[in-house]
């Protein structure tokens, strides 16, 4: 018996308003506990993106940034060994606390796959709280 070929990869699109409404729905049920779920979602989402970027290891961070932009997660990124600066995160919405939980999970996944070990990713600055950009600190564990 011949198995059927794998279906072509398909994508769904959510706009910024829909992402915000989903976040508010979860927060209404789970309060801030849902932020960990959003982070884990980001990790899952980031797995295939990281694998795609690793196909060109020499240009991994440039490729990772391009993928994030192509998929609508960000408008601009800048990567170093210890920090990622993001402008135009899709998760930005006015708040007293950082809101880019999924993006933080995606970035952690990128660095863990690139470095081959565990890292901690902390959103130290967020455009949601009035800053001009989001900044994520990367620390090896």
Model-derived features: positions:
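N-terminal accessory segment detector
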Residues: 1-101, 119, 127-135, 139-141
């Amino acid at each position: 018996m011949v198995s059927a070929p794998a279906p072509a990869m398909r994508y769904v699109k959510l706009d910024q308003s829909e992402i915000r409404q989903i976040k508010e729905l979860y927060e209404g049920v789970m309060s801030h506990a849902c932020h960990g779920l959003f982070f884990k979602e980001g990790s899952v989402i980031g797995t295939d993106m990281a694998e795609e970027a690793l196909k060109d290891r020499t240009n991994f961070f440039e490729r990772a940034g391009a993928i994030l932009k192509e998929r609508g997660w960000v408008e601009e990124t800048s990567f170093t060994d210890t920090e990622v600066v993001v402008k135009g995160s899709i998760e930005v919405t006015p708040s007293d606390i950082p809101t880019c939980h999924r993006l933080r999970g995606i970035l952690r996944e990128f660095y863990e796959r690139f470095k081959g070990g565990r890292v901690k990713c902390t959103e130290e600055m967020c455009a949601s709280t009035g800053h001009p950009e989001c900044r994520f600190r990367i620390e090896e564990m």
